Amino acid sequence: MNNLKLARFFATISKESKYVPNSGSYPLGYKVGAIHCGVKKNSTLDLAVLVSETPASAAAVFTTNKFKAAPVQVSRQILNDKNGKGISSIVVNSGNANAVTGKGGIEDALKMVDTVDSTLKNAPSSTLVMSTGVIGQRLPIDNILKGIPVALKDVGSSHEDWLRCAQGIMTTDTFPKLVSKSFEIDGRKYSLAGLAKGAGMICPNMATLLGFFVTDAPVTPGALSKILTYATDRSFNCISVDGDMSTNDTICAMANGAAGGEEISETSSQFSKIQDEITLFAQQLAQLVVRDGEGATKFITINVQDAQSYADAKKVASSIANSALFKTAMYGKDANWGRILCAVGYADADVNVLKTNVSFIPADGSAELKLLVNGEPEKVDEERASEILELEDLEIRISLGTGGGQEANFWTCDLSHEYVTINGDYRS
Amino acid sequence: MNNLKLARFFATISKESKYVPNSGSYPLGYKVGAIHCGVKKNSTLDLAVLVSETPASAAAVFTTNKFKAAPVQVSRQILNDKNGKGISSIVVNSGNANAVTGKGGIEDALKMVDTVDSTLKNAPSSTLVMSTGVIGQRLPIDNILKGIPVALKDVGSSHEDWLRCAQGIMTTDTFPKLVSKSFEIDGRKYSLAGLAKGAGMICPNMATLLGFFVTDAPVTPGALSKILTYATDRSFNCISVDGDMSTNDTICAMANGAAGGEEISETSSQFSKIQDEITLFAQQLAQLVVRDGEGATKFITINVQDAQSYADAKKVASSIANSALFKTAMYGKDANWGRILCAVGYADADVNVLKTNVSFIPADGSAELKLLVNGEPEKVDEERASEILELEDLEIRISLGTGGGQEANFWTCDLSHEYVTINGDYRS
């Protein structure tokens, strides 16, 4: 147990240095920050705020879990009521999910919104609210309401402010997940920032998946909503740590237009360009969540090709990514094509069993290792397989041989002893 | 590692003594046995046969995995061709699944059928064939074909013969799964014997789920097929060790009528009586498979009540039973209603979130422990919860509060360090 804790500590340090940026290129017109207000018992950051200098377009994708947390219900209502227009800020507390908390929980979430709006002199209902942490307990709402004006005074737009904001939404995450980039459309520079949290679910800290994208591009609410759905489908909905979906999962986007330029609608010529940029960006952010999967020692890309449809390709990829047997084999560094094939076979998708191919694509750029060709097993060079499986990153490519030509990517991690330790033994 | 192996060894001994019967009440007109013929490298039993003295009705439910093993394809064809009539025997090899073996594999399976039929002077295609074990390798078919006449000479109808037959189909199972019982219909005594194997999938020994029921009641093929589907839906399709479905899964039934009496068809008055008997029996056998789940330390019954439909109740139960987070919480003896609720919430079924109840039903008959009442968390007595979770057996009762009144049961085990060790570390 002590060895495991030590190993996890060192893994954390190494992940921090690998995946947390030292600088960034952030969108104009946003200020962010985070403080400790007293939700978490230790003194770590637990209240994060993000403020746009001007009211922005906003969109969100919420959990489909039937037990929707209070902040999910409240934020969804606000976005509906305002048709995704005039959203100025986001407030997030970590340490308590405000889920399964009844009417009182809804009132608490509304109070958080009202306090942000009145402090900033926003129009009413201009703020989205999110929570992550323990479920079934009421928020320490007084601490939060007292903290909000303090947090809002302490916002800024430096790299350190963004990093602090990303830290403020963490629960069991071992490192803050923050990405940023700039890109050009028609000669104009736009920037994107993304923050996320999530590392499987640990109760009492049920670690929700939260993700935020904010840009200074001018995008209509309708276009932003379409882009977010498309990007989420191909990023946060294509990752699996343990297959469970929490009561609080929320991915949201804001576009304030601070960088100027013509407003981008669904029919604009720039629409597909910005959709592609945001999708790639969302994938980058989602992959960080997988890298921080509880007890993860491997980062696995599952690439499914030649399916009849994108949906079929995704079903097969998801079936593999969620197979406990496959995930333990990866942890054991075992070139077990049987388990991969098995998971392909029970997915609800068209497969040509006589034309199915399975290969390992090594992360170091060396030649692929074929495991199954046209439904027949290859004689596998076990030494070569071991070499490939020693690397942290691995891509598994499956061709379903249907002639449909459709493709999907999915990202997952392995299932380790440490996962069981974190999720089963945390009381000891 | 050595401690784990030792623990598993002692767990095996204790399971053997608890779940393997010392005697039985077997159906008339069957002879069974098993030998070592040389499929497995060690000298354990690897070829089992079951022979009915007269041609019998037969039915089977096969894996829905798209990569169907050769014996699955061959047995299905035989049952189709003969409309489930005139089946005299079953032959099973363990140690090699004859899966993903192409045309040669089909030929091997057909040879096994032909050799049994010619040795017994059966009509052609009177034998069903099954295989379990490594996938992707051709059978050592000569050893098997030489072994078949030897095995068929050495059959009997004693308890020891039935036990030997159950041992002959084992791969990674830690104990043979054999049950038998007698029951009366209209004053006539009938008997049932059941054998099963399965303990999660371990590659290279991908441990298929196989199950057999044989009875001396006279049942038409149509009625038997209906009964088997009904019973399997409520037994083998209601268990989960790790959620994966193999290329070889097969549940089959035979009814030879050796006990006499009027033939039972779908319209007979005795139909529902024998269907209920076989269903209860199938549940008993399926539960043994869960008890032998890889690394299992807990046996968990999930009882979902007040669903809109049986299908909905089963979906919710299955969602909980397959949640890695729930299963690790059970291993950690943690009364984590949040994870249960979460799995309820993402199942594709009607749920009244304001009327959902969750309770622990202790195995020792003491009072239930309410965790969630009408969607609101109870103050849980942690000491009482710990007491309940110390027991090997536990029932979790969930009421969905829909007013539909439908109910389903599901059986599962926990997810332990040992599961990861068995499935990830077996090469070390």
From Swiss-Prot, chains A, B:
Subcellular localization(s) per the UniProt record: Mitochondrion matrix
One GO molecular-function entry: glutamate N-acetyltransferase activity
InterPro entries, A to Z: Arg_biosynth_ArgJ, ArgJ-like_dom_sf, ArgJ_beta_C
Enzyme Commission (EC) number: 2.3.1.35, 2.3.1.1
Catalytic activity: N(2)-acetyl-L-ornithine + L-glutamate = N-acetyl-L-glutamate + L-ornithine; L-glutamate + acetyl-CoA = N-acetyl-L-glutamate + CoA + H(+)
Main location: mitochondrion
Record keywords: Acyltransferase, Amino-acid biosynthesis, Arginine biosynthesis, Autocatalytic cleavage, Mitochondrion, Multifunctional enzyme, Transferase
Record-level GO cellular component terms: mitochondrial matrix
Record site feature (Cleavage), residues: 207-208
Presence of the UniProt keyword Mitochondrion in the record: yes
Active site, per annotation: 208
Additional free-text comment from the UniProt record: This protein may be expected to contain an N-terminal transit peptide but none has been predicted.
Subunit structure: Heterodimer of an alpha and a beta chain.
Protein name in UniProt: Arginine biosynthesis bifunctional protein ArgJ, mitochondrial
